[in-house]
Each structure stands twice: as C-alpha cells, then as structure tokens.
A protein has these predicted regions:
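Conserved GNAT acetyl-CoA-binding A-motif
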Residues: 106-115
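Conserved active-site tyrosine of GNAT-family acetyltransferases
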Residues: 127
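A generic structural signal for short
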Residues: 71, 88, 111-112
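Conserved beta-strand-loop-alpha-helix junction that forms the acyl-donor binding cleft
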Residues: 114-124
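GNAT-family acyltransferases
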Residues: 1-77, 81-85, 98-106, 119, ...
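Glycine-rich acyl-CoA binding loop
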Residues: 90-93
Length: 159
C-alpha cells in the first residue's frame, strides 16, 4: 500500500482546533504538526484542493497534512507538513506529487506555488524533487510573522 491522501474530516478539524488528539483517525505519536491548526480552519471551505491528511504508506497512521488554495486567477499555493518522527522518508515529496496529480486535470489551474522557509532547506528539496522550479526569495507572512522564504512554481498543462 502506498501513501494515501484523505480529506480531513470535520471531526478531525474540530479536535485539532480544540487542542485535542483526533479520535476518528489513528495518528503518529508526535501529531499534530506545526501547521495542523491552520489547516483545520480550512476544512469548512475545502474543495478538491484539500485539506488532506497524509497516511503513512507503511503504518496505519496519519503523519501530516497537505492542501492548496487559490491565491489568484489560475494560481494555487500549496502547503504541507510531516511530523518530525516521519521526516526524511520521502513522504512529503510523495504527497506533493499526489496533490499535483489531483490538480493536473483542472483547467482553472495554470501555476502551483510553494513557499519554503530559508531555514528549512529540506522543505525546498521536497518541492524541487516534485518538479517545482525556484523563482525568487520573497517575504511571506505566517501567523502574523514576516518570514523570508523561497518561492517555487510548477506550471501545469493549463499554463
């Protein structure tokens, strides 16, 4: 069985927002990720772009999340996170590739963007291995904090 993306449920989102462990899925011991709460707020507005929980291909555990949202006409920004105990196994790259496969048939997406923190080169490696090209360094805001990040893009067939 390979890595699996499954839409985050309202029950999982509610638990995360209440600082509780989800009871409707089995999760890694160090779940949630640093982005779980932010992702959980997107469940009510979620569509084909997620958010999704990431299931380990070797264990019956959720080990992270991934999703995307339109940031402009034809442009989707994606974000992803894997719990520390499961990093370095290629799971984030595989999840990004799977999300790109799901986006591929869409005619309304021309460009997929990802921002990776300068202090997390492994995150940049994820999108690079998934086929993204480096665009430039930019300032991004995360939870009210301005960060310097690398911007990456993946051009779809529609683009």
């Amino acid at each position: 069985m390979g890595l699996r993306l499954e839409r985050m449920t309202a029950a999982t989102a509610a638990a995360l927002l209440a600082d509780q462990r989800p009871s409707d899925i089995e999760v890694a011991a160090d779940y949630p990720t640093e982005f779980s709460k932010g992702v959980a707020t997107q469940v009510a507005t979620g569509g084909e772009l997620g958010p999704y929980v990431i299931h380990s291909p070797t264990e019956s555990l959720v080990v992270g999340e991934i999703g995307g949202a339109f940031t402009g006409e034809g442009t989707v920004e994606i974000g992803y996170a894997i719990v520390e105990s499961h990093r370095g196994r290629g799971l984030a790259t595989e999840a990004v590739r799977e999300l790109l496969r799901r986006i591929a048939p869409r005619t309304d997406v021309e460009r997929v963007v990802a921002h990776t923190p300068l202090d997390r080169p492994e995150s940049a490696r994820v999108v690079e291995k998934a086929g993204f090209a480096f665009v430039r360094e930019v300032e991004d805001t995360h939870e009210g904090e301005v960060l310097r990040v690398k911007e990456w893009e993946f051009l779809t067939k529609a683009g």
